[in-house]
């Protein structure tokens, strides 16, 4: 028996050694994939006749320089009204402290001004229908599209300021991730929220699954250039922490609103959520309690952040297999009856144009693709209709120009990159699922 055990242990050890040797040989022929600006994307390891791509989410890079790119600012305000700001400009982090109402940043020859003295009040989640409510979804860090679409639709003026009077703008989730300009999008909406309030209007930023990923430290969908900048500024969890202006503001945003007789949420309302009796205010309260560390009940968590909850549900358009069944006409009627609504607006699931489904009881508005018709949803005097934005999304669906270079086991920076790759994937695996 002892000999058998000894042979078995030797066999296991020999196999492990052979695997390590094979992995070392593979690494000696590996390549590092980078963005065109030098941020690390993947480690390409030869496997057989192909290459296996190991994603890195560590925010590392080789002499990264991103022309004209401003990321941030991350602003923390003190009790005495002063503030401290950190931002990334092209290839380095800069900092400033001050006490004024605005923060002015000069980056790559362009001036950017941010309001830092006030936090926008969160608009009521249940409100009477304004004359006009314009709804967009799934901006996903595409600041160029957002700015151009809002100008085209006369929501903003030529200087990018609020021009929509007492009307309402709704972003139905997923303003962040994928695109590089996440901070630019959030600061634009933050600023417009202040200006809209002053004019008697409102901006509603609903949380989608990607805002939830961001606030929980899930970097798996982050643009790598943006992730590099985030890492230089302290990492995603720190940069969007509740002690920052943008992080605190995001944690206050709703997951569902009701405008007159129209419910708006990112993914949709699972019939199970309606059956549980949750109101709009119940659901938003549960989400805010979660961010503050006051853990909601399991039923509340399933409703607001679960795999079949408000931000992940796709049941009005497709079958979610184990997670949820496709909603029946009767179930949609029951959801609407529960909220006293006649229609529900959802993003999250791609469509080729802003589409009325289920005889107009559901409006699907996620047109975030290059092939979809450039449209938004306008609810005028309670009646929804698709309107052209006049602006294409212009998505870089291939992820930009990618570069590769050899990986070396004998270069300290490459070994550090490998360690950081492993640790970043380990950190992602440690994020509790589903919540």
Can you annotate each of these PLM segments?
Residues 2-435:
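Feature recognizes metal-dependent phosphohydrolase scaffolds
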